């Protein structure tokens, strides 16, 4: 099988995009997982594109390397896709003309996901509407948990851990560097998470509220599967989950000039290597609804690149 691909990243979250029309029926998952493997394109997620249906511009299926299955959402993929559609010929491949001001409607398993293209000249950026994923979180529920003796939150399918909980349990650990003791602790908590939560998946976020640069709110990293060395320096869905957990835990407050119902704009330090935080910024906007729930969610990332384009040959 010979398939065209384009690869990129969002702050180190590596993404490969494939043309689904080139994949044999019934082998989409198998081939995508092979492409994600270190022997081929070494990526965290794959996006399989098809022409749009039911009013959407594109239909998107998503494969996660950590979970080894189709998944409902991937924010990093939508950010890379925005860059791909504005800087390569893949927009024309699907008969799309994408420019500043365009809104591209993606048909995903989570529902219609709009991405808005903005910028000046050739410098494009993408804002992803994550409201459908936010709804998935609330549908699956949010709850505090005690795992391996430490507090955490289940936010939908995500396990969200505040790094201070690792510091309390491991006084000698440098948790922000994900040292050996911190990794063992995270693995133990995740193993208990799998036992206790039917919603559990390979979706894990570590954060704290000790940013190193003024104007930022949180630091994040996403060690989805430490035993498999699958650690994402940035993650769109994980960033939304972190903000929901931080609100629930009281580390963030909804505030603004419009009062309690003002949109909450947050900056998360991310990207770079396998440390908590990083040189990039993930921007999250949450719009409050009724009660204590958020009604809408949006995000963008400061560092999105297309890294290569070509063809892959697989057996």
Residue ranges and their predicted role:
Residues 1-139, 149-315:
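A glycine-rich beta-to-alpha transition motif near the start of alpha/beta enzyme domains, typified by
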């Amino acid at each position: 099988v010979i398939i065209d691909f384009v690869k990129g990243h969002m702050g180190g979250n590596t993404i490969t995009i494939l043309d689904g029309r080139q994949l044999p029926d019934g082998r989409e998952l198998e081939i995508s997982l092979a492409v994600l493997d270190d022997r081929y394109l070494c990526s965290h997620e794959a996006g399989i594109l098809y022409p749009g249906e039911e009013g959407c511009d594109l239909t998107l299926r998503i494969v996660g390397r950590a979970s080894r299955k189709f998944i409902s959402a991937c924010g990093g993929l939508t950010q890379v896709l925005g860059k791909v559609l504005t800087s390569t010929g893949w927009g024309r491949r699907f008969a799309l003309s994408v420019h500043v001001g365009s809104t591209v409607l993606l048909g995903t398993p989570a529902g219609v996901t709009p991405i808005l293209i903005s910028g000046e000249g050739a410098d494009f950026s993408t804002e992803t509407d994550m409201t459908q994923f936010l709804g998935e979180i609330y549908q699956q529920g949010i709850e505090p948990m005690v795992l391996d003796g430490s507090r955490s939150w289940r936010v939908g399918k995500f396990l969200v851990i505040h790094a201070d909980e690792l510091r309390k349990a491991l006084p000698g650990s440098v948790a922000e560097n994900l040292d050996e003791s911190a990794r063992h602790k995270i693995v133990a908590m995740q193993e208990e998470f799998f036992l206790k939560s039917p919603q559990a998946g390979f979706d894990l976020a570590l954060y704290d509220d000790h940013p190193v640069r003024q104007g930022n709110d949180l630091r994040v990293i996403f060690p989805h599967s430490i035993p498999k060395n699958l650690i994402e320096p940035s993650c769109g869905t994980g960033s939304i989950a972190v903000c929901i957990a931080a609100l629930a835990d009281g580390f963030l407050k909804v505030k603004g000039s419009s009062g309690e119902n003002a949109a909450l704009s947050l900056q998360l330090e991310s990207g770079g290597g396998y440390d908590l935080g990083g040189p990039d910024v993930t921007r999250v906007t949450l719009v409050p609804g009724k009660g204590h729930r958020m009604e809408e969610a949006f995000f963008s990332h400061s560092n999105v690149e297309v890294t290569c384009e070509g063809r892959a040959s697989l057996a």
